[in-house]
Amino acid sequence: MIGGVLSSIYFQVNNEQKLKEVRDVPALALEATIPNSRVTGGGTNVEVFFRTHGNIRLVKTVGKGEFKLGTVQIDSFLSSVKVEQTWADTAYQQNLFFVHPKTKEMTNFQEDIKKVWETLQKIPDGTVAELAISFDKSYTLQELEPILYSVFEAQEMPPTPVWYALDTGLEAASDDRPRISSFEAFRFPEHIHFGNLETKQVKTKEEEVLEMMRVLSQHEEIVKQVTQRSSKELNLQKQYQYVKKHGIKVYGIVITGPSKELLKLQNSPHVRDATLGDIEFWNWFDRPSGSRH
């Protein structure tokens, strides 16, 4: 009883911002590092003796449907954070990869890329899919729009980018390891959620991405524990400063939509690599607000 009262006083009076950090920084970090992920709920409870216990529920978007990825349990004691991940599938399978434009040698992956397009060609019309594509160079978000428009043209509901591979200058591009796991570098989702974190006012998508990077770089210890990466792997401050100087540019995206529409990307001169994620039955229609899988 006394421990619970002390915890409430600690978080609510002296450290309300600390509670927000324990609750909302992990959610922001997960959406930035797990491909095509979105936090849909969960909560954080203050427990005895300065501890908190929280759960974050993650989903992914394939077509217009949301499908459970898993749950991340986060327990904190003062500034220490413990993380436990439980995936909907026994082990979360990483099928989405990117290739940085600096990587020149792609010979070993030509057969894999060919199989991606063949799969999209062979699967039935009534399906939607998730696809990671890499571009021939890094593009601003404004430059990306006409590239996608040239592929899909005017449609009421064209395939939708849901996650972006951000060029931070630190991507591990080499000829002996050309593909970069989508867990390895900084990304950002289509919709960035700051929760109740104190943030600067932003007006553009680019400003929003920079603000996300600023917030995460200021909480590197929490991000490190939540994403289970080392400071050397994250290097958040260095990535933030690079993007702040060079601007928001992306060299790949995760995009979802009707399988046959995604197949059109095969003919784009700007697409140099493709990896296929999940395939689901047709759901390419707008759902009533609040509807979820």
Identify the function of each model-found stretch.
Residues 26-58:
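Short extracytoplasmic
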Residues 56, 164, 168, 185, ...:
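Hydrophobic transmembrane signal anchors and adjacent membrane-proximal interface regions, especially
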Residues 13-27:
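Ser/Thr/Pro/Gly-rich low-complexity linker/stalk segments immediately outside membranes or between
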Residues 200-293:
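Extracytoplasmic/luminal low-complexity segments enriched in Pro/Gly and acidic/polar residues
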